UniProtKB/Swiss-Prot annotation:
One of its GO terms (cellular component) is extracellular region. Residues 1-23 form the signal peptide. It is found in: Secreted, Extracellular space, Extracellular matrix. The active site is at D291. It is an enzyme of class 3 (hydrolase). Glycans are attached at N43, N103, N123, N342, N424, N504, N543, N601, N653. Transmembrane segments: none annotated. This is Probable beta-D-xylosidase 5. The lineage of its organism: Eukaryota, Viridiplantae, Streptophyta, Embryophyta, Tracheophyta. It comes from the Eukaryota.
Length: 781
């Protein structure tokens, strides 16, 4: 090749690359474009709303409808590039959605544990930090064109039924915990610390799936056809609670409606749920998006409308603003032409969408010149971020049983057998909706750091389903020659997943036989490690004498192996608490997953759901968890009488209930100061759970369905060995001490209330509150 031809070819390549980069700009309002200055939507001195309205006013109907879908086409004539709205960040930046890509520039991102495990930490500051890390990595990837700015996370559905395949994505069964997680993770993702009144967003977060969505595919009944029959009582105090907190306290910028119907109406077509509640009552400042193809689902699968145009009109009029999928893009224009929809309905939806992009800086020019513009590939998978992923896994691990053999001594283990289908897990540990992790540390790799030359490994099963017994004999032989065995069993995405609910609560296939045979062959200590999201009935294992300890490790993320090993060998003192009730198999045998009721029914024999209502005997209770230390708690100060001011003032009545709409709730707060003493020789963290037991008269006053007990506060406290720490728990009385009646109305009940401090794995203490009606809201101590 001649030098001249080489130079020409080089210039052509440079021009092509430059052209490609130009065509792939991930921002609008490029200051180098002459026309930019005349566009009102590029004028940063105007309000977001004014800029969004200006942009929408410049679009034709054909252009408008193509911006109502996740794969927005953009408006090239105005310098607005295409934008992919769908990105995921459930527990790390994920390439599950089309908005994120990994390549040689950014090969992976920090992969935290599944949400169900980080929820077990009961650590609000951890949840906030995780959100901050994820949003930093998202912004860094956006700056190099590998990620969007809108993330459809977190999942804040309550883990209603232990068989649900997507329970792993949630913070558990308790509405307060789910709400606290939602608020903190959303703030971590979205908040810009020096934003002031600008309401800028770091990235946009989305709370999903609204609402009463917690069934995917159980015995042939799928989420696309399921009609969730929910009482007003359960809707108010269980299903809606996390979403309300997410919007009102977390200030989330998006909510996603779900596939299912609620009481006969598809959630994405319900004007009461969307326009009435989210937009009207809760005052969402953001957009409402459908789960992917939800409009198509209610048209094609359940034939909810006669025509596609009717389906589109119904959704937009109900308050939907965006469609994950292409249904709105295909049929909205014709719906307007047929007068089933007004052009103003389309404009309204687009304005809500564009305001979010304005807050993200998408219309402020090159992101490299904006806040977070300095972030790049070196800010993804940083050492600090990977250390936080390890810390999150350690904080969530729950010690279920310990007969004194843990922690294992680091120097006296002569031969360690590592057994089980999840013993060498890698991808299993990062759960679903995960991206490419920075790196993996499997359980066996973590354990090898403590016993580098004395480990023997046998899987015992070909996979988690464990369909045959052929590998069990080799596992038994390995165990018989070892003095300590770590047996890692459980579930994975082939057993519990999106689109796949469990039928049973037992270990799959021959895993139970593997556990029994290993335990019977073991000379000494067996440590049983359970990797799963949903609970498993392991009652049989409690009676096997060689099983000296049991750990639940959820799906522990990229650093799971190190976390497990550090807990087993005592470099970390476990402190996690179960965020879900562990039910016996009997529950799955008797209770239909399609029954949405939370409260028990003695007539039908329905036992109720979650620790708040379940009347059966669980394998392990919500909040259960052991430590290598011994802790005690005590109340240092707390009110004993609460006077409630009502409007109008009501007469004192020892056995009455008051609608909270008549109560001056604004200043009705109480504070409890609690002390925690560590009696052990190890420093550790203690999760203090504060439960509330309503007055005995409550059932008759609110029409039944009163919780057995209810979590009203929690705090994770670090306490040095032989040291004492104190902390405060603040309660909003109207939220914490209220009950929901059968009409869905919140009531305060006067009389004697009991606070229970500690779970059933702790030494519980009690504090009594006397709630009275009065002419003022003074709290007497």
């Amino acid at each position: 090749m001649s030098i001249r031809r080489f130079v020409r070819l080089s210039l052509l390549i440079i021009a092509l690359v430059s052209s490609l980069c130009e065509s792939q700009k991930n921002f609008a309002c490029d200051i180098s474009a002459p026309a930019t200055a005349k566009y009102g939507f590029c004028n940063v001195s105007l309000s977001y709303e004014a800029r969004a309205k200006d942009l929408v006013s410049r679009l034709s109907l054909k252009e408008k409808v193509q911006q109502l879908v996740n794969k927005a086409t953009g408006v090239p004539r105005l310098g607005v590039p295409p934008y992919e709205w769908w990105s995921e960040a459930l527990h790390g930046v994920s390439d599950v959605g089309p908005g994120v890509h990994f390549n040689g520039t950014v090969p992976g991102a920090t992969s935290f544990p599944a949400t169900i495990l980080t929820a077990a930490s009961f650590n609000t500051s951890l949840w906030l930090k995780m959100g901050e890390v994820v949003s930093t990595e998202a912004r860094a990837m956006h700056n190099v064109g590998l990620a969007g700015l809108t993330y459809w996370s977190p999942n804040v559905n309550v883990f209603r039924d232990p068989r649900w395949g997507r329970g792993q994505e949630t913070p558990g069964e308790d509405p307060l915990v789910v709400s606290k997680y939602a608020v903190n993770y959303v703030k971590g993702l979205q908040d810009v610390h020096d934003a002031g009144k600008s309401r800028r967003l770091k990235v946009s977060s989305c709370c999903k799936h609204y609402t009463a969505y917690d069934l995917d595919n159980w015995k042939g009944i799928d989420r696309f056809h399921f009609d969730a029959k929910v009482t007003k009582q359960d809707l108010e105090d269980t299903y809606q609670t996390p979403f309300k907190s997410c919007v009102e306290e977390g200030d989330v910028s998006s909510v996603m409606c779900s596939y299912n119907r609620v009481n006969g109406i598809p959630t994405c077509a319900d004007p009461n749920l969307l326009r009435g509640v989210i937009r009207g009552q809760w005052r969402l400042d953001g957009y409402i998006v459908s789960d992917c193809d939800s409009i198509q689902v209610y048209f094609n699968d359940i034939h909810y409308t006669k025509t596609r145009e009717d389906a589109v009109a119904l959704a937009l009029k109900a308050g939907l603003n965006m469609n994950c999928g292409d249904f709105l893009g295909k049929y909205t224009e014709n719906a307007v032409k047929l007068k089933k929809l007004n052009g103003s309905d389309v404009d309204e939806a687009l304005i809500y969408n564009y305001i979010v992009l304005m807050r993200l800086g998408f219309f402020d020019g090159d992101p490299k010149s904006l806040p977070f513009g300095n972030l790049g590939p070196s800010d993804v998978c940083s050492k600090d971020h990977q250390m936080l992923a390890l810390e999150a896994a350690k904080q969530g691990i729950v010690l279920l049983e310990n007969r004194g053999d843990l922690p294992l001594p680091k120097t006296t283990v002569k031969k360690l057998a590592v057994i089980g289908p999840n013993a060498n897990a890698t991808k299993v540990m990062i759960s679903n909706y995960a991206g490419v992790p920075c790196k993996y540390t499997s359980p066996i790799q973590g354990l090898q750091k403590y016993v580098p030359e004395k480990i023997v490994y046998e899987p015992g099963c070909k996979d988690v389903k464990c369909g045959d017994q052929t590998l069990i004999s080799a596992a038994v032989k390995a165990v018989s020659e070892a003095d300590v065995t770590v047996l890692v069993v459980g579930l994975d995405q082939t057993v519990e997943a999106e689109g796949l609910d469990r039928v049973n609560l037992t270990l799959p296939g021959y895993q139970e036989k593997l556990v029994r045979d290993v335990a019977n062959a073991a000379k000494k200590t067996v440590v049983l490690v359970i990797m799963s999201a949903g609970p498993i009935d392991i009652s049989f294992a409690k009676n096997l004498s060689t099983i000296r300890a049991v750990l639940w490790v959820g799906y522990p993320g990229e650093a799971g192996g190190d976390a497990i090993a550090q807990v087993i060998f005592g470099d970390y003192n476990p402190s996690g608490r179960l965020p879900e009730t562990w039910y016996p198999q009997e529950f799955a045998d008797k209770v239909a997953m399609t029954d949405m009721n939370m409260r028990p029914n003695s007539t039908s024999g329905f036992p109720g759901r979650s620790y708040r209502f379940y009347t059966g005997k669980p394998i392990y209770k919500f909040g259960y968890g052991l430590s290598y230390s011994s802790f005690s708690t005590f109340v240092l100060s707390a009110p004993s009488i609460i006077h409630i001011k009502t409007n109008p003032i009501m007469n004192l009545n020892k056995t009455t209930s008051v609608d909270i709409s008549t109560v001056n709730c604004h200043d009705l707060k109480i504070r409890i100061v609690i002390g925690v003493k560590n009696h052990g020789l190890r420093s550790g963290s203690h999760v203090v759970l504060v439960f509330w037991k309503p007055p005995k008269c409550s059932k008759s006053l609110v029409g039944g369905g009163v919780p057995l007990t209810q979590l009203v506060g929690f705090e994770r406290v670090e306490v040095g060995r032989s040291m004492t720490e104190k902390f405060t728990v603040d309660f909003d009385v109207c939220k914490a001490l209220s009950l929901v009646d059968t009409h869905g109305k919140r009531k305060l009940v006067t009389g004697h209330h009991k606070l229970v401090i500690g779970s059933n794995s702790d030494q519980q203490i009690y504090h009594h509150l006397n709630v009275r009606l009065a002419g003022d809201s003074t709290v007497a101590i």
